[in-house]
Amino acid sequence: MKPFPRAEISRKALQANLARIRELAPQSKIMAVVKANGYGHGLLNVANSVATYDQGADGFGLARLEEALELRSGGVNARLLLLEGFFRVTDLPLLVQHHIDTVVHHESQVEMLEQAELTTPVTVWMKIDTGMHRLGFSLAQFDAIYQRLLACHNIAKPIHLMTHFACSDEPDNSFTQAQIDAFESVTASLDGDRSLANSGGMLFWPQSQRDWIRAGIALYGVSPMVGDKGGNHGLVPAMELKSQLISVKDHQAGDSVGYGAFWRARKDTRIGVVAIGYGDGYPRHAPEGTPVWLNGRRVPIVGRVSMDMLTVDLGLDSQDKVGDEVLLWGSALAVEEVADHIGTIAYELVTKLTPRVAVALLP
């Protein structure tokens, strides 16, 4: 018997998305970004699905060292990059031992590299802040820091170079081009690989594609742009979040449903209860009208989302019954559409599922 709620992860979809990304960026290597438990899809589920498919992903991007070590212990031998870099000097021997690249974005990391005693140099990606103003060295700092990295015996040469876009999901926003130009202004004559494009850069700013692209949300079949869908770019949703009806009851006009008697039926209707709630990661603030997919149609959420359940207005003439499968998002109901209704982004929905949701990797 299948558990509910459950997230079904399609290996076929992940592989199809990898192939599509190669079509979109044919001259670049692909770094599959699998941080945050593979964007909620399961770290090893994703990595093993795309590590050896066709050419396979050329590398994997992680946020934390623990994620990289999990990939290594899971048998993934591809190139790994810590996108936030290392946090402690004691992390450095682990980078050497497990052949893990690191971003360097702050002078404190440079100091740790200069002071460490390592048996083998570490491969470094110098992050340049071209306008995101989160991590990275400013353009004014660049030359001095780059020279220190060149002089450091604990750093493998050449030094690789990267930046991160603030607005790449906005095709009409010239800020991304300004970031590209800023990056080129300080790196044009230097050796080493370059990585500028994230999913938004790959899709909407092809001129940002360099040696490596960092494919995050696109790998999972989702568009980074609000109001857009991955399917518009030939991408396939990799996750289907499913549950089932556990109650179907008739209610009269004026009956309230849920905590706070927040919603009242405007006419006689039939209410279904779905076994999923904010304890599973479905947002409590989902407003009335947020759709779920049931028996071939969109059905609106009514009342407040509870910890373990949410309620939907089936309509008085519906034939839905207890045990019927409910799709919260997936192929028939894009996660981007659900996110738009809720007032969030698809990234947040897929990454916030809790351990109560069973995750199953399908062929």
UniProtKB/Swiss-Prot annotation:
For this protein, what reaction is catalysed? L-alanine = D-alanine
**Transmembrane: is it a keyword of this entry?**
no
Q: Which sequence positions carry the modification called N6-(pyridoxal phosphate)lysine?
A: 35
Gene Ontology cellular component terms for the protein in this record = cytosol
Quote the CDD domains the UniProt record gives.
PLPDE_III_AR_proteobact
The record's section on InterPro entries has: Ala_racemase, Ala_racemase/Decarboxylase_C, Ala_racemase_C, Ala_racemase_N, Ala_racemase_pyridoxalP-BS, PLP-binding_barrel
- Choose any GO biological process term that the UniProt entry carries and state it: D-alanine biosynthetic process
Identify the SMART domains for this entry: Ala_racemase_C
Recorded E.C. number(s)?
Answer: 5.1.1.1
Instruction: Mention one GO molecular function.
Output: pyridoxal phosphate binding
Kind of enzyme, top EC level? isomerase
* Annotated residues for binding of substrate: 134, 307
Identify the cofactor(s): pyridoxal 5'-phosphate
| TM helices/strands, residue ranges | none
Q: Where is the active site?
A: 35, 259
Q: In which pathway does it act?
A: Amino-acid biosynthesis; D-alanine biosynthesis; D-alanine from L-alanine: step 1/1
Question: What keywords does the record list, in alphabetical order?
Answer: Isomerase, Pyridoxal phosphate
Q: Which PROSITE patterns match?
A: ALANINE_RACEMASE
**Which NCBIfam families does the UniProt record give?**
alr
Q: Hey, which family's this protein in?
A: Belongs to the alanine racemase family.
Its job: Catalyzes the interconversion of L-alanine and D-alanine. May also act on other amino acids.
Q: What is this protein called?
A: Alanine racemase
User: Per the UniProt entry, what species is this protein from, by scientific name?
Assistant: Shewanella denitrificans (strain OS217 / ATCC BAA-1090 / DSM 15013)
